[in-house]
Amino acid sequence: LVPSPDYPLWTACVNLAGGTAVHYLCDEQSEWYPDIDDIRSKITSNTKAIVIINPNNPTGALYPKEVLQQIVDIAREHQLIIFSDEIYDRLVMDGLQHISIASMAPDLFCVTFSGLSKSHMIAGYRIGWMILSGNKRIAKDYIEGLNMLANMRMCSNVPAQSVVQTALGGHQSVNDYIVPGGRVHDQRDLVYDMLNQI
């Protein structure tokens, strides 16, 4: 299950891996939150996983704990793997707080994706990671495949790796960007105002 609208790479990844991407609705009339009834209606015996993008790209929606809990409940009921794209987790504004869905589902196998590309304004560096948590026993083949891919890589982005510790520790300059007067905050407000004038 993949959100709609989604970041197109998710649909491509599912299809390239031999799956069939089935899209669930994120409803504009409900602050772009996932439509829980639509998710339930799309689950079949072939459904293996659910993708969430939180904060969402392209809508910008940040899912509250109540919505995340409903997704966890569905995943638990149907034994779904959760793939959670959280690359924008540090770009949360207006006093809101990002909650990682993996923290709410220690019994479920979750793959959480993040990185520095968005939060630290270094998209060209291509430095990111995935965290595997929960019940890894159900994903032995998946983990074996990840290890194989990792071992086949000839080299990593060494310059980007050298900035990870500094970027994640100490002063978080991203915090200066997301408050009033900060570049990201003010650009967001400008784009929002301009789009609403159309």
Q: What do these predicted ranges mean?
A:
Residues 1-14:
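Conserved PLP-anchoring active-site segment centered on the Schiff-base-forming lysine
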